[in-house]
Amino acid sequence: MTVDKIALVTGANRGLGRSAAVALATRGVRVVVTHRGDAAGAEKTVEQVQAVGGTAAVLRLDISDVPSFASFTSELGAQLERWGTSRLDILVNNAGVGVFGPLETVTTDDFDTVMGTNVRGTFFLVQSLVPLLAQGGQVINVSTSLTRHTSPATSVYSASKAAVEALSRTLAAELGPRGIRVNSIAPGPTATDFNGGAMRDDAGMRQALAGQTALGRVGEPEEIGDAIATLASEGLRWVTAQRIEVSGGALL
């Protein structure tokens, strides 16, 4: 029996994660979507996947809870078996958090939450799931254009994503002998519900940022999802250890 490729997309109950799941499904990939507590949002993602003819399953995952990864890996393995395989082909590390504020307002708890989720969680989830990744599989870590340009009050978030990009390059070297490639996708200003939906809902913010992009607008979630799905395709099988920015030419 021929089994479709299978992807795990973390934080796929909304925003970029949902768009990535749907874009992958459009290309014939089965998708496991995770959420931290928004089961309804995850089910909506499943509905959208099914609407494009895809197949999806839902698992709960708190990316900041590293000790839970062992049981999560077992649950994922059981889902893969239900689909007739033991392999995972694509891991999209999308789940993350952001705390934004000037230097004097950031607390140690804020710092630890962002680093513990975005860096520690991402690293140890890859470590946990590598045994399931097939020869020729891949990891795509979601970063941000803020690792290239600066914006006030984003220091902790952008630093966490810079660490993710460094991890991506190093892990690409470590996992390359197994045929596993690792890349990072760096979205620019995008109209999602991240950070309370500020980019999506604040017309003034969108207009200001649109004026700083080569293409004259902010991005849409579907455009990031398409970029992730394209990077996951066989057509880009020779690409690894790269940071690919998807920003419409923001802040050149």
Regions found by a protein language model. Name each.
Residues 13-14:
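Conserved glycine-rich cofactor-binding loop
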Residues 126, 160, 168:
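Active-site helix of classical SDR
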